[in-house]
Amino acid sequence: ERTMTKDNNLLGKFELSGIPPAPRGVPQIEVTFDIDANGILNVSAVDKATGKENKITITNDKGRLSKEEIDRMINEADRYKSEDEKQKNRICAKNSLESYVYSMKQSVEGDEMKDKISESDRKNRILSKCEETIRWMDNNQLAEKEEFEEKKSELEKVCMPIITAMNRAGGGVPSGMPGGMPGAGGGGGKGPTIEEVD
């Protein structure tokens, strides 16, 4: 019932290991939840690049809560709903900033853009602002949603004019750019796709 995993009842856990190192955002892990008619939960995770897989089966006797415990948790979920929503929005803003800064950094460090942006703009403006933002994030993990949004806006103000000028000069938008172009919906993404299977 709750947004944060720490506030829910743990039924079991497993680890998917052996994923090769890759740039942030590159690994794709497909997680599938399947509940059968008997209440047995099967969870599997597959690394799409390597095919490595792990799974767990949770029978309906593991981690069972009493009726009173379930009612208590539902009441807590209702009581903390607005706090949970605020926390969720804060984390989404943090993730959006983090995704944007690392995507921008990776894009301007890549070969595709090195020749299209001046060394001064690349190093002294974009990469410098990215590093400053990363340091700020490291020191402000518990910042509010508005603070994360403000930092993203500051970074976009530095990056947008340079990328726009590159586009006007015929450079085109590199494929790794967040949202196709900074500020164009970069960072948040669509989120997970959930498919229901009978």
Swiss-Prot record:
What domain of life is recorded for the organism?
Eukaryota
Record keyword Manganese present: no
Keyword set, alphabetical order: ATP-binding, Nucleotide-binding, Stress response
Region Disordered: what ranges? 170-198
Q: Which Pfam family is an annotated match for this chain, by its short name?
A: HSP70
Q: Name one GO molecular function term.
A: ATP binding
Q: Which InterPro entries does UniProt cross-reference here? A: HSP70_C_sf, HSP70_peptide-bd_sf, Hsp_70_fam
Mark out the compositionally biased spans (Gly residues): 170-191
SUPFAM superfamilies, per the entry: Heat shock protein 70kD (HSP70), C-terminal subdomain, Heat shock protein 70kD (HSP70), peptide-binding domain
Q: Which family is annotated? A: Belongs to the heat shock protein 70 family.
What PANTHER family does the annotation carry? Answer: HEAT SHOCK PROTEIN 70KDA
Know the name of this protein? Answer: Heat shock 70 kDa protein
Which species is listed as the source? Schistosoma japonicum
